[in-house]
A protein has these predicted regions:
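NUDIX/MutT-family hydrolases
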Residues: 147-188
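Short, glycine/charged-enriched secondary-structure capping and boundary segments
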Residues: 81-83, 130-131, 150, 171
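N-terminal leader/linker segments that precede catalytic domains of diphosphate-processing enzymes
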Residues: 1-80, 87-101, 105, 109-117, ...
Length: 213
């Protein structure tokens, strides 16, 4: 599908009800499901963050989804694949401001160049105690990305067709900073394993797109 057709169809996503936990659970590790169950009725004070789920055309007008591999550092999300985004700062007016600011800082896309389509369902990440708000956006006339090398190891430009292909969903055995030898559902895209909160966000997005494409 070319980007022009995609933009026409995705505009209708605003009218669809969000799927939330129902879709998140499909790509959630079993340990995550247990953790979320334990905190469901607690009054935990969560940190806030936001990410931008960005679609754009490549040089052939093919639709791509932007992911990035984070650098290795001392933290639970070290060397993981995710969306541009990060924690709320005092200068941010709201969570959308956070997502736009972080997207500019991490991959060099100006806020004014992003058409924000809608929010997706927020998701809580127990290991880091962040509640993350995803936003869906379009980058119509992309310039070359400029990565923040201190945080971003590389960009992963995923063709829409690969993202939508169910054959690219796998079960992967992983060891993380907080769990060892666990089997997790994941997307295998461009040679990278995408799991955890990012995969859970993508699960909802994919279910919504299936209703439109």
């Amino acid at each position: 599908m070319n980007f022009d057709d995609f933009t026409k169809r995705i505009s209708k996503i605003k009218n669809l009800p969000l799927l939330g936990e129902e879709s998140h659970i499909k790509m959630a590790p079993s340990i995550r499901i247990e953790e979320l169950g334990k905190i469901k009725n607690t009054t935990l004070v969560k940190k806030k963050a936001a990410v931008m789920v960005l679609f754009y055309p490549d040089k052939n007008n093919v639709v791509r989804l932007l992911l990035m591999l984070r650098n290795t550092y001392k933290g639970v999300h070290s060397n993981q694949v995710g969306f541009p985004g990060g924690k709320v700062e005092k200068i941010d007016k709201n969570l959308l401001d956070t997502a736009l600011r972080e997207t500019f800082e991490e991959v060099g896309v100006p806020s004014k160049s992003i058409e924000t389509i809608r929010e997706l369902s927020s998701i809580y990440i127990p290991p880091s105690n962040f509640e993350v708000q995803p936003y869906l956006g379009l980058y119509h006339n992309p310039l070359p990305f400029v990565i923040e090398e201190a945080e971003v190891a590389s960009l992963i430009e995923v063709p829409l067709l690969d993202f939508m292909n169910d054959k690219n969903i796998i079960i992967k055995n992983l060891s993380t900073s907080y769990a060892t030898n666990i089997d997790v559902p994941a997307f295998k895209l461009n040679g990278y394993v995408v799991w955890g909160a990012t995969a859970m966000i993508m699960s909802e997005l994919k279910e919504l797109l299936k209703q439109l494409l």
